[in-house]
A protein has these predicted regions:
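Active-site-proximal, substrate-binding regions of enzyme catalytic domains
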Residues: 1-95, 102, 111-113
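Active-site-adjacent loops and short helices of periplasmic peptidoglycan-processing enzymes
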Residues: 105
């Protein structure tokens, strides 16, 4: 099963101390570079960053189409993490996109995700 996640669901689980739920449910979860940067570069989550860096199931990968990411950001107003997650899920035919933002879910749904 191929799973792609955006930033906020991971942050929520990290803050609760239950990031491992994703591992138990899905085994491996792909996150695009922008999501990784949002997770590890935010000063609010310094205490939780080790959960991401030390994770054996969160796999950071590059998106295949940066042009699509840029266009999606410009057209939809989504941020880099949301846009990269949607483009990655679409291009890799993911079974599930984990995203909590209403606007992002709406865009993903219109794209058939």
């Amino acid at each position: 099963m191929l799973i792609v996640s955006d930033t906020t669901p991971i942050i929520t689980l990290m803050k609760m101390g239950h990031l491992d739920i994703l591992k138990h449910l899905y085994g491996k979860v792909l996150i695009p570079n922008a999501v990784y940067m949002e997770l590890t570069g935010n000063e609010k989550f310094v205490a939780e960053v080790s959960q991401v860096i030390g994770s054996d199931f969160l796999k950071v990968e590059e998106v295949d189409n940066e042009v699509a990411v840029t266009i999606l950001q410009e057209v939809s107003g989504l941020d880099a993490g949301e846009s990269e997650a949607i483009v990655m899920a679409n291009s890799r035919k993911a079974d599930l996109l984990v995203m909590d933002e209403h606007k992002g879910r709406g865009v993903a749904k219109k794209m058939g995700l």
